[in-house]
């Protein structure tokens, strides 16, 4: 167990791991911090010709020759223009300066690069048998990687600021607003004009889940305000996208040191999953590794020792273009599957650990909605539903959105239309997921890109 610290000390993603062996194998890479600036030197301007050179007869008198008055003319010196340097633009606190104004070259920093094992025979097989596929993948690298790295840098800068303001007494609605305002400011897309939110911004509603609420809870308009308390365990899960390239990352904050081992268990389990991820990695092996690491921990609550359990019915997942959930899953418990990770995959490796029964049920309320582009609209007759669907397609596409996002666009009286869309299976609704009352759940998550010759933990920062 970690050493106790003075009261009100925040325990979160910056805590050192009680499993240094894992961190030694997969150390966090120092990511770009919120004060990172890029500047460039303007090139030295070409010196202009002397204005007298264009006068008639100017070419008759060479420099240094004797003039008509018998005096030797002095050679004229061209004035050198001094180099000028662009003013460095720093990120503000809270972060509200668009990254495009800081990174003038529009090139964003790479994240943690992990080379594949040199004794992996499949690496040579991939290079020999799929050369054409790799060349196609490499042709996409510049745009693909830069979009992902920009989204990741936005996520890092926003969450680093947010960690400084998360304290007992803050309202969760204020916290959600700080996160979402920061993302929209740094991507320079407020999402108020039609289609603007599809260019860059929030990939899904900010998840702020307390204690036994594991996932899919966000403040909703008109709901009772929720205030963070000292004994709460808060999970912060938000996504950033740039041109549909989604970075999904989450962390947990606790102030009371009794939860130290719970957070350490989940953080170590996530890092173990990231370490095992790679081209041709067996998902069954990754799942078993995650469970073994997480369930090696115990937590003492109310003078009772409780084992940390891996949550059984929620999983990590691959991420697709404009879709937060793909068709591949990474459970946190031992599973029977022959599925493997593949080159070019993007995975959100996340883990949830619980002091409860580690099985989640749907709670009352709605977290958000997602449009199913493959659903038939043949049975849709209500004009309000058709109008709402048009708004959803134009502003969110297949990205998950919440009621707050609709009302931010000025959409009113949408409840009947939304009910019709959900009933017809055109839009899917997501409920909060909860463990038993009195239990505590923690979460950590990173997005990893499985590139041809390495994996890039794109959301890695110096915080977690």
Swiss-Prot record:
Domain of life from the UniProt record: Eukaryota
Localization of this protein: Cytoplasm
Chief subcellular location: cytoplasm
GO biological process per UniProt: proteolysis
Cofactor(s) of this protein: Co(2+); Zn(2+); Mn(2+); Fe(2+)
InterPro entries according to UniProt: Creatinase/aminopeptidase-like, Met_Aminopeptidase_Type2, Pept_M24, Pept_M24_MAP, Pept_M24A_MAP2, Pept_M24A_MAP2_BS, WH-like_DNA-bd_sf, WH_DNA-bd_sf
Protein name: Methionine aminopeptidase 2
């Amino acid at each position: 167990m970690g050493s106790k610290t003075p009261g009100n000390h925040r325990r979160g993603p910056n805590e050192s791991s009680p499993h240094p062996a894992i961190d030694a194998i997969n150390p966090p890479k120092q990511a770009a911090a919120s004060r990172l600036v890029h500047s460039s030197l303007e090139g030295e301007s070409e010196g202009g010709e002397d204005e007298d050179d264009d006068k008639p007869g100017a070419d008759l008198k060479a420099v240094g020759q004797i003039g008509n008055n018998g005096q030797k003319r002095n050679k004229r010196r061209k004035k050198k223009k001094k180099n000028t340097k662009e003013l460095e633009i720093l990120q503000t606190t809270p972060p509200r300066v668009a990254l495009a104004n800081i990174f003038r070259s529009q090139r964003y920093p790479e994240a943690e690069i992990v080379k594949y094992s040199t004794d992996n025979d499949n690496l040579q097989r991939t290079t020999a048998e799929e050369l054409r596929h790799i060349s196609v993948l490499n042709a996409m690298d510049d745009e693909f990687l830069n979009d992902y790295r920009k989204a990741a840098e936005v996520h890092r800068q926003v969450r680093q600021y947010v960690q400084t303001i998360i304290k007992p007494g803050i309202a969760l609605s204020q916290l959600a607003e700080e996160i979402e305002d920061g993302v929209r400011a740094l991507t320079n897309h407020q999402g108020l004009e039609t289609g603007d939110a599809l260019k860059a911004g929030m990939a899904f509603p900010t998840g702020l889940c307390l204690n036994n609420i594991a996932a899919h809870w966000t403040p909703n308009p008109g709901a009772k305000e929720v205030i963070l308390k000292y004994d709460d365990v808060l999970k912060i899960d938000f996504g950033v996208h740039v041109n549909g390239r989604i970075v999904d990352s989450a962390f947990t904050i606790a102030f009371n040191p009794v939860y130290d081992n719970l957070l350490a268990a989940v953080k170590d389990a996530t890092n173990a999953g990231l370490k095992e991820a790679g081209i041709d990695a067996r998902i069954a092996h990754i799942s078993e590794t995650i469970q073994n690491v997480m369930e090696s921990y115990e937590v003492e609550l109310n003078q009772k020792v409780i084992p940390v359990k891996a949550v059984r019915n929620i999983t990590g997942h691959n991420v697709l273009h404009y879709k937060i959930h793909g068709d591949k899953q990474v459970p946190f418990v031992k599973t029977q599957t022959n599925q493997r990770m593949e080159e070019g995959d993007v995975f959100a490796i996340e883990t949830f650990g619980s002091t409860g029964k580690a099985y989640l049920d749907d709670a009352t309320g709605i977290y958000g909605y997602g449009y199913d582009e493959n659903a038939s609209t043949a049975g849709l007759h209500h004009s309000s539903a058709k109008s709402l669907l048009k708004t959803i397609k134009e502003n969110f596409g297949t990205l998950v959105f919440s009621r707050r996002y609709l009302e931010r666009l000025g959409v009113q009286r949408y409840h009947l239309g939304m009910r019709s869309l959900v009933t017809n299976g055109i839009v899917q609704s997501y409920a909060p997921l909860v463990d038993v009352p009195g239990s505590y759940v923690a979460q950590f998550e990173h997005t990893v890109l499985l590139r041809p010759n390495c994996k890039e933990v794109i959301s890695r920062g110096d915080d977690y």
